[in-house]
Design a protein with these regions (language model features):
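Conserved N-terminal phosphate-binding loop of PLP-dependent enzymes in the Aspartate aminotransferase
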Residues: 1-348
């Protein structure tokens, strides 16, 4: 890969829509980021004790992510989302976790994946404590709190995907609305109020939105302060790193600051503080700031959506192919003659 293109064995170039499953946000083979990673490799890459690079990365993370007073690094998203669930259960003394039905993935661990249709090989009892509600429907979440009083440890959700966190009286199309972002009573604020009222933690999963919606996270765009938050994907332009951040009061339960206190085995991640990935993270943030990358996502994405939808309309296939979602992270939809989503059409 180079820039926005990937090449096959015949050296044919393809413009890459997915960009490393959205983990590559600056471009393939970026020399500055590669050099930053290489410099850490020749300095040892993975040390027994915490490195200065890890310290710098941690200081940078808590500086740019408003809700993060502490941070723990890992290698992939499932590690940190499951760690967040452990913290929530330990902090509240409760068992149940609520997640939106519409958001398809939070972890490959049994607590979540066992609650989906792809559950072969999981333990049923592990997912018995995972509850589902409807995104943008606060009443469906209120219903869970009534059914499970004082039993829900956390509500975990992505701040936005294709769907936007709208206000109750939003008149926009739910899959295209970008207008409710800064309104104080959008869905995320309703969730935050409800979790506080019930002594439940709010966990924002920013795997997709992080370092794409806003340098300081979608939590900044929507002016929301979660108890815990998780990041990954575009943190380091394709290098493997993820992060769990949050309030010190909660995060410290996974630390060793209080001798004799009962501890959480928060993560097992030998390579979690690998210096090459953390060096890439530091350089990626530097480039995002320097080159106004986030602004470019929004501006170029808007043009891309409009242009592709116009082409589809000109070809008279706009009922079967169209682009929707946020301008900084557009998604293309393919449908068959019956109007059903078609994955085989998507491969074309």
């Amino acid at each position: 890969g180079e820039g926005a293109y990937i090449f096959d064995l015949k050296d044919d170039a393809y413009l890459d829509y997915g960009m490393g499953l959205r983990s590559v946000n600056i471009g393939y083979g970026n020399r500055e980021i590669a050099d930053a990673a290489y410099n850490e490799i020749i300095n040892g890459n993975n040390l027994t004790r915490a490195s200065v690079t890890e310290l710098k990365a941690a200081e940078l993370f808590v500086d740019i992510i408003p809700s993060a007073e502490m941070v723990k690094f890992a290698k992939h998203g499932s590690t940190v989302t499951t760690a967040a669930i452990k913290l929530a259960r330990a902090y509240t003394g409760r068992k149940f976790i609520a997640v939106p039905i519409e958001q398809p993935f939070f972890s490959f661990d049994d607590w979540f994946i066992g609650s989906t249709v792809i559950k072969l090989g999981t333990l049923e009892e592990a997912s018995n404590y995972t509850l589902k509600f409807n995104y943008n429907n606060i009443d469906s979440l209120k219903k869970l709190f009534l059914e499970y009083p004082n039993q829900i440890a956390a509500v975990m959700l992505e701040p936005a995907t294709i769907q936007s966190p709208c206000t109750s009286n939003c008149t926009h199309e739910k899959n295209t609305c970008e207008g409710c972002s800064n309104i104080e009573n959008n869905f995320l604020h309703q969730v935050r109020e409800l979790t506080k009222l019930n002594g439940t933690l709010m966990i924002l999963d920013e795997m997709i939105t992080g370092f794409r919606w806003n340098l300081n996270g979608a939590q900044t765009k929507y002016n929301i302060v979660p108890d815990l938050c998780t990041f990954g994907k575009a943190m380091a332009n394709g290098f493997a790193v993820a992060a769990l951040g949050g309030k010190r009061e909660v995060m410290k339960l996974g630390g060793i600051e209080e001798p004799g206190a009962e501890r959480i085995f928060l993560t097992s991640t030998t390579h979690g503080a690998e210096m090459s990935a953390l060096g890439a993270f530091i350089k990626t943030v530097e480039i995002i700031k320097r080159d106004n990358i986030i602004e470019h996502y929004w501006n170029y994405g808007k043009q891309l959506k409009q242009g592709m939808n116009q082409i589809a309309k000109d070809l008279n296939i706009n009922d079967y192919f169209y682009v929707e979602g946020y301008s900084c992270s557009p998604t293309y939809i393919t449908k068959d003659k019956s109007g059903n989503v078609s994955m085989s059409f998507r491969t074309l």
